[in-house]
Every structure is written in structure tokens, then in C-alpha cells.
């Protein structure tokens, strides 16, 4: 029987006090990546972390790698395209074999929402979900929260703020994780997308981006995940962008002088999701999200491996 071990599979695995602890620690690292204590570095020095990514990643896998190295740990990234899964080895057997090598933590990404929960049944080391199907991406939600926490000056100032998710909400694990986390913190939520990209939900919805901009203090644009669509929804991405791109013109006309915050989990389709000029605007926090990804993942790794 596996020993009890803390995992991070979804944001609900964390209490509000633990979320606050992570925000405080990540804020320190966001201000100075070198602010790792000597004690932490000594404890992390012999830790070995394995990254098992069965889906493509740029920001998340690089962010975890840099976070691990900054803490003083070692990370092993497996290329799953050249692993034994390509020879017919099952996912569970691959995981059990890696687990038998006794890493100190495993970070995984997979196309199926249930995968991290299945793997956690066998894991005696911390397991971190770096994206599962369309359901969860907890560290992305936490780094997005850190970005808002910094901008608005604390959790108490986030309560009552309004956030609109614009784009392929139905297929977005980022949206799903953020919605669950931000609801716990008292934010009001609107979903904006064509009907085919909206989930069945009791949340407020609209098909009109102008309505979403008028509603929101925070806009989170989402990539159109064509790889998860059974059939084309728009004739082209350009047609989609004509309806749902966050542009300077739309912000000027409908933000009503609000200093809206603009987020995107990446990768951004320029001039489809967000206009290039808006990405360079001070209201865009996209690169801050990327920086905060390293800081938050440092905090998460330290929390799971040392606390």
C-alpha cells in the first residue's frame, strides 16, 4: 500500500491558507529568483524531479525546469516520442518504471483528464499535474492568481472583481482551473465564446466580446484549441479573430476608462486572440504571467518536497 503523499492534481487539493502561503512564497521569488534560502538549497540539492509530458509544452515544462534548478534540485525530462510508449508500453507501466527509480517528485501532462488521478494511486512521491485533458492545470491557475494578486495588491482586493474568459472555454483546462479557484476567492465570472466553445454551465455567458469587455475588470483570452475540435467551427482563425480578438479599438469603445488587466496562458495567436498592439500595452500581463510561472512553481515544489 503506497504511503500517504501530498499531490497537486487540482486547485481544490489546496486549502485557502495553503494558497496564501504559496502566494507569499512565490511573491518573494517573483521579486528575486535568487531569494532561495541556503537551508532550502541544501535540502533540495539531492532532490531529483522527473517531467513526464505526453503532450507538447514550451512554457510549462521550461518553467518547471528553471524552477527546479533555481531551487537547487535536478530535473530529468523524458522525450515521450522516443520513449518505450512508442513501442507499445502502457502509460501505467511507463509510470511504474519511472517511479521505481525513486525520483523525489514527478510532473506529468496528459491528454486525458483522469490520468493524474490514476497515476496518483501508484505514486509514493509528490505528483504534480501540469495539465490534464480539458479539466485541470493547477499551477497555471496559481500563477495567474499570483499575477492578479500582485496587480490588485492582495487577495482582499480581488473579491468582487469581474473576470471574463474569452475564447475556447469548453476545451480549456486553464479556464476550468481558474474558474474553480477564482470562484473560491469571490470573483464574478463571465464566459464569452461562440456556443460551440461554451460548456454547459450556470455561469453568466455571452457570445458578444463587447459585452464581456464592458463587464470585466480582467480579461483572460484563450487559445482556440483546434486540436481538440471534431470539426472546424470557423472557416478560418481570421474569421474567429474578427469576432473575438481583443483589440485596442474594442477596449477604447467598451472598457469605459477602466484599466482592465489582460491575461493569456499562451501560446498566443497574435491578432487572433489578442491584437499585437494590445500585447505590447501596459495592460497586458502576459509576460508577467510567464515570469510568475517560475516563481509559483518554485513555491509549489518547495511546498510539496520540503514542507
UniProtKB/Swiss-Prot annotation:
<keyword id="KW-0808">Transferase</keyword>
<dbReference type="GO" id="GO:0016597">
    <property type="term" value="F:amino acid binding"/>
</dbReference>
<dbReference type="InterPro" id="IPR036901">
    <property type="entry name" value="Asp/Orn_carbamoylTrfase_sf"/>
</dbReference>
<comment type="function">
    <text>Catalyzes the condensation of carbamoyl phosphate and aspartate to form carbamoyl aspartate and inorganic phosphate, the committed step in the de novo pyrimidine nucleotide biosynthesis pathway.</text>
</comment>
<dbReference type="GO" id="GO:0005829">
    <property type="term" value="C:cytosol"/>
</dbReference>
<comment type="pathway">
    <text>Pyrimidine metabolism; UMP biosynthesis via de novo pathway; (S)-dihydroorotate from bicarbonate: step 2/3.</text>
</comment>
<keyword id="KW-0665">Pyrimidine biosynthesis</keyword>
<feature type="binding site">
    <location>
        <position position="267"/>
    </location>
    <ligand>
        <name>carbamoyl phosphate</name>
    </ligand>
</feature>
<feature type="binding site">
    <location>
        <position position="59"/>
    </location>
    <ligand>
        <name>carbamoyl phosphate</name>
    </ligand>
</feature>
<feature type="binding site">
    <location>
        <position position="173"/>
    </location>
    <ligand>
        <name>L-aspartate</name>
    </ligand>
</feature>
<dbReference type="Pfam" id="PF02729">
    <property type="entry name" value="OTCace_N"/>
</dbReference>
<dbReference type="InterPro" id="IPR006131">
    <property type="entry name" value="Asp_carbamoyltransf_Asp/Orn-bd"/>
</dbReference>
<dbReference type="GO" id="GO:0006520">
    <property type="term" value="P:amino acid metabolic process"/>
</dbReference>
<dbReference type="GO" id="GO:0006207">
    <property type="term" value="P:'de novo' pyrimidine nucleobase biosynthetic process"/>
</dbReference>
<feature type="binding site">
    <location>
        <position position="137"/>
    </location>
    <ligand>
        <name>carbamoyl phosphate</name>
    </ligand>
</feature>
<feature type="binding site">
    <location>
        <position position="109"/>
    </location>
    <ligand>
        <name>carbamoyl phosphate</name>
    </ligand>
</feature>
<dbReference type="Pfam" id="PF00185">
    <property type="entry name" value="OTCace"/>
</dbReference>
<feature type="binding site">
    <location>
        <position position="266"/>
    </location>
    <ligand>
        <name>carbamoyl phosphate</name>
    </ligand>
</feature>
<feature type="binding site">
    <location>
        <position position="140"/>
    </location>
    <ligand>
        <name>carbamoyl phosphate</name>
    </ligand>
</feature>
<feature type="binding site">
    <location>
        <position position="223"/>
    </location>
    <ligand>
        <name>L-aspartate</name>
    </ligand>
</feature>
<dbReference type="InterPro" id="IPR002082">
    <property type="entry name" value="Asp_carbamoyltransf"/>
</dbReference>
<comment type="similarity">
    <text>Belongs to the aspartate/ornithine carbamoyltransferase superfamily. ATCase family.</text>
</comment>
<feature type="binding site">
    <location>
        <position position="60"/>
    </location>
    <ligand>
        <name>carbamoyl phosphate</name>
    </ligand>
</feature>
<comment type="subunit">
    <text>Heterododecamer (2C3:3R2) of six catalytic PyrB chains organized as two trimers (C3), and six regulatory PyrI chains organized as three dimers (R2).</text>
</comment>
<dbReference type="InterPro" id="IPR006130">
    <property type="entry name" value="Asp/Orn_carbamoylTrfase"/>
</dbReference>
<feature type="binding site">
    <location>
        <position position="87"/>
    </location>
    <ligand>
        <name>L-aspartate</name>
    </ligand>
</feature>
<protein>
    <recommendedName>
        <fullName>Aspartate carbamoyltransferase catalytic subunit</fullName>
        <ecNumber>2.1.3.2</ecNumber>
    </recommendedName>
</protein>
<dbReference type="GO" id="GO:0044205">
    <property type="term" value="P:'de novo' UMP biosynthetic process"/>
</dbReference>
<dbReference type="GO" id="GO:0004070">
    <property type="term" value="F:aspartate carbamoyltransferase activity"/>
</dbReference>
<dbReference type="InterPro" id="IPR006132">
    <property type="entry name" value="Asp/Orn_carbamoyltranf_P-bd"/>
</dbReference>
